[in-house]
Amino acid sequence: MNKLFHTSKVLFATLLLAMIMMTTSCSSEGDFYSKVPEDARFVMSIKAKGLAEKSNAVKKMREIANLVGEQEAKDAADMLETLFGDDSPVDLNNIVMFEYEGNVYAWLMVNDVEMLDKIDAIAENFEKSKKDDFVIYEANENCCIVMNGNGGLMMMGNDADSDDAIKAFMDFDDLESDKAIANNEIFMKNMQGDDDVYLYLDIEGLTSLVGSTAELKKALSREFENEGLSVPDYIDEVMESFVYASASFTKDAATLKMSLLDDKGTNIINKIYGNKTIDKKILSYLDKNSSFVMACSLPEQGKKMIEQALSNSLPEEMKSTASEIVRHLDGNMAFGITVTDSIMAVKEKYDYWSDSYYTTTEPDFTRCGYTFVAKCNTKMDDYLSSLAGYLGMSVTNGVITIPNDEMNITIKSDGDYVVVSNVGTPAQSLAGSDLANDKQLLMYFDCSKNSSISSLINSELPIDLDATTTLTLDKECAMLTIHVGNNKKDNILEYCFDLIIDIAKSK
């Protein structure tokens, strides 16, 4: 925890100055975007004031500072009190930063420039000067802020000198409307609204910062070709696309949404997947109390990747059977893990240095339940018989049983489904669950209050964990949601702050 706050005074002062200045005059993302060039490769908007209020950040940071006792932590708490306290001289709304030609910029607005000189962290770490109509604040060669009236521009980069910053200020301030990123309708549709954070990435533009985009495409194509795949069209579409992401925080949930769009606003992932969605029946083979669930509906290229991976890893005599099985997959697969309360086991260990034995308690993952399900486009009985023959085993009532010292694994065919499991048919399944409805991908992690995972964590840490995490992909976007139950705080961010504080107190 202490290491978290070992930051330099210059970095702290830069952050303070940037947060103070990115305020007031521009009250919405759109106001800032009109001064951002259309070919910016990275844009981020954060509603700082709203996030601070939701998380009760001022109070919580003070608690952490008192707990840690480090000066850097106390400085950070002082900063938040200055910015977000009741007597704050500024009104924080949106912070918008962007990348352009290798440097990072942020438009800055403040009502009272003179107040900056009264803040110790600024006065001690920034050198103030004037040039023509500009007031200049310089921390070092990597950070420079130039101000003209109430407007200012922060520039961060390898050679962020005041002359370059002044030129950038004038160029961006006089930006013609059709040269601003605000002129991009797709950008504006996806980068403003009620969410708390917005992010835009130009993939091709960003990759060009580290080398030739064309060479990177060729390298990726070669890697896929080595796996027996030809996906140049997909690579081109992904590399030439744009990431749009947003995050929101409510009382019960933190939600991150992300889309990959082309320059016409078409969803690239949806183009690759087509109209395939997860089979509704497949979850019925998984335990209702599964701690972790993953389900997907693979596109054709995904099936080819599995076939190639099996071909590269299996013995020669098994390759033909495995290939036949993969060819009959329709792309729907699901996997579940059920963690039980008995997962912790006492084991005897040998210590080489002391030449003695000792006991320890650690997870025994063989005590978990595992189930893998694949849907096929034909009945798989004959193929399972071929597999059993290779393994030297028989098929009994459509089931192959593979004995093991630690667990028994069964492989069975149930109509169009192949099920591999060490626990058999669950007493209660996820049949009827809407988790995978209209989804192309689902991942679910259960740490709800009465779950085995939550009980195990709560036994080790003094926290009351009650949460589930869900990652889904559908025709619109990818979405990650962390949901907390019975939250006694006003927002999930404050809930997370309290978890951190409780864990820190236990150390």
Question: Which residues does each PLM region occupy?
Answer:
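Bacterial N-terminal signal peptides that target proteins for export
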Residues: N2-A13
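A short, solvent-exposed beta-edge/loop patch
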Residues: M44, Y137-D171, M294, E406-L435, ...
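Short Gly/Thr-rich strand-loop-strand
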Residues: V110-G149, P363-T366, N377-D416, K439-I463
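Hydrophobic lipid-interacting interfaces of membrane-associated proteins
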Residues: K49, N158-D163, D202-S208, L261-G265, ...
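Long, C-terminal catalytic modules of enzymes
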Residues: G432-K507
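Bacterial N-terminal signal peptides
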Residues: F12-T23
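Structural boundary/hinge residues at secondary-structure and domain interfaces
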Residues: C26-N140, A180-D364, I500-K507
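Long compositionally biased, domain-poor regions of proteins
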Residues: V90, H328-D382, G389-L391, N397-N408, ...
